């Protein structure tokens, strides 16, 4: 019997890749929101302009 579980997490490779894709998507959304927040705060502060 073959064991398709990857590493100590007990997840299969397909499951690990699915979780990883969600993590990457969440990081991209967070980064985009942070970028927008930084741009808006730079526009709103009079001493930077």
UniProtKB/Swiss-Prot annotation:
The keyword Membrane applies. Pfam families: LHC (PF00556). The chain crosses the membrane at residues 22-44. Keywords: Antenna complex, Bacteriochlorophyll, Cell inner membrane, Cell membrane, Chlorophyll, Chromophore, Formylation, Light-harvesting polypeptide, Magnesium, Membrane, Metal-binding, Transmembrane, Transmembrane helix. This is Light-harvesting protein B-800/850 beta chain. One of its GO terms (molecular function) is bacteriochlorophyll binding. The keyword Cell membrane applies.
């Amino acid at each position: 019997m073959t064991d398709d579980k990857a590493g100590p997490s007990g997840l299969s490779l397909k499951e690990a890749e699915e979780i990883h894709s969600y993590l990457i998507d969440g990081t991209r959304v967070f980064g985009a929101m942070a970028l927008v927040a930084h741009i808006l705060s730079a526009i709103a502060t009079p001493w930077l302009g």
